[in-house]
Amino acid sequence: MAMTIDVQVVSAEGSIYSGAADMVVAPGEMGELGILPRHAPLLTGLRPGELRIIHGAETEYLFVNGGVLEIQPHLVTVLADSAERATDIDEAKAMAAKQAAEARMAGQADRMEYAAAQAELLEQIARLKTVQRLREQGLLR
């Protein structure tokens, strides 16, 4: 019997994913993390990006907008600021939000407003990269 790891992905909206996986790939703050069963315990922040949950030949693609990742030897818990299935991303809306953030950054002298616009820009770029990756793999048209 193959060894698996339980995965829970939750956000303020509720549970996004719950199930077993052979491997999880998460967008950690310092880079991507590959998590297998029996991984050493770890607690780290997440940056906006693609979360991949691999089970056999199937891969579930989610988009997380930051949060916290807790790893135990037999359990991965993602407490996301927000999360959605990657196939549910509205590409046109993400592109419009990216352009709006760029415009806000261009005309902003206030550091706090600039930082907020920059965070929004990074989120939308990560969303668009996720859509592009799914399209390249033939999972989106």
Where are these regions (language model features)?
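A positional/architectural concept
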Residues: 1-61
